[in-house]
Curated annotation (Swiss-Prot):
Chain sites annotated for binding 5-amino-6-(D-ribitylamino)uracil: F15, T47, F48, D49, A71, V72, I73, L104
Family the UniProt entry places it in: Belongs to the DMRL synthase family.
E.C. number(s) listed in UniProt: 2.5.1.78
GO MF terms, alphabetically ordered: 6,7-dimethyl-8-ribityllumazine synthase activity
Protein name: 6,7-dimethyl-8-ribityllumazine synthase
Source organism of this protein record: Saccharolobus islandicus (strain M.14.25 / Kamchatka #1) (Sulfolobus islandicus)
Role noted for this protein: Catalyzes the formation of 6,7-dimethyl-8-ribityllumazine by condensation of 5-amino-6-(D-ribitylamino)uracil with 3,4-dihydroxy-2-butanone 4-phosphate. This is the penultimate step in the biosynthesis of riboflavin.
Active site, per annotation: H79
Record Pfam families: DMRL_synthase
Lineage: Archaea, Thermoproteota, Thermoprotei, Sulfolobales, Sulfolobaceae
Amino acid sequence: MQGKSIRLGIVVAEFNYDITQLMLQKALSHAKFLNAEVKVVIKVPGTFDMPLAIKKLLEKDFIDAVVTLGAVIKGETKHDEIVASQTARKIVDLSTEFNKPVTLGIIGHGATHEQAVERIEEYATRAVEAAIKLVQRTRKIDELKEVKETVIID
């Protein structure tokens, strides 16, 4: 990573704690490896409870992006589908409302506990990487003045 450091907030669900705490550990170590600063970690009861915490972090000038971490495990009803879809929708809304990246490190819906355990590292590290890349790339967009030819930002 070059230039201005990237400052992250992490919102992590306590529900399915055995999974989400490992996700948090992986995310913290990966952010450090990529030289990003994790400024705040907020724990919320479940993924459905994330939007308010995300919004509060996005309001802070010292947060460039928010990483969400959670696991929505399949149950016997469609509750997991409702939780996952409503949370994802609101996360996208908040990202565009505040013009800051919010990345989705939420395992599920439809995942079994075993599948969630297998996906811990993948989802946690990808969410951190996505947040960092999006901050870097949106900064490049902000620096554009006039474009006469196609610009590829990566």
